[in-house]
Amino acid sequence: MEKVYARTKGIRDDMVSGFCPGCMHSTVIKLIGEVLEEMHLLDKAACAVGVGCCGLHMDYITYDYFLAAHGRACAVATGAKRSNPESLVFTYQGDGDLASIGLAETISAANRGENFTVIFVNN
């Protein structure tokens, strides 16, 4: 039988979602893993993870990550990208982490033209 769908290599296969029913985090995490696998970037990816529900992100992924202090994921991602320019660095942050306490770091990183991606999940 032809396999139509398989779990992405970007997500651990021994984990079951612990997010609340209807929460979009599990969908976003799955999509990130699928895109990184499809583009052959799993071994180059590094994610700065915010706190709160976003912090659960690290339990499900197979690529590199680091947990940042509340609101400081963009500052941590800046250091990661500058120290390893060839890596694909991105942040994964929720609304409280990014739009509340971390807005100054996010705007400052954008103003400096830092070369990383911010994934903002308004949960």
Residue positions per predicted region:
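Active-site diphosphate/adenylate-binding microenvironment
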Residues: T8-A69
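Short, charged low-complexity linear segments at domain edges
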Residues: M1-R7
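Thiamine diphosphate
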Residues: V51-N123
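Conserved N-terminal glycine/acidic-rich loop preference
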Residues: M1, K44, E114
